[in-house]
Amino acid sequence: MRFRSVLCSHLGRPNGVVVEGLRLAPVGDRLATLLECPVKSLPEITGPVVADAVSAMVPGDIILLENLRFHPGEEENDGVFACELADTVDCFVMDAFAVAHRAHASTNGIIRFLPSAMGLLVQREVEAMGQALESPERPLAALLGGAKVSD
């Protein structure tokens, strides 16, 4: 079965304003190369441009929305913005384990408006973490890292 896929993501920390160097069109281009199929990158996150593009999709089409963090409501978990994100799609699949803990409109707010599920990557991460906590193989070494390891 082929689906119509609307992808959303963020890049960097533009703090609710458009930063030209953080647009997702290059990400869409790279994704199209990796998938060997077209990916339509939109210059908007919500609104008529998005609604029209989604309405015109056929099974197998992929759309990538613009950087979610360009919208001030994303990191504030704004309910109106979350509802706008949900308006043009039928369901939500969360497949970004690294940001699943964040209470943002696209990770937390949207689930109030749509049937939601975890994606395969998140499922694998959760299973691996569960295995590491419940029955780790010994000897064991834990490596922690990241830009905000103190968090």
Question: What do these predicted ranges mean?
Answer:
Residues M1-D151:
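Active-site loop-to-helix "anion-binding N-cap" substructures in soluble metabolic enzymes
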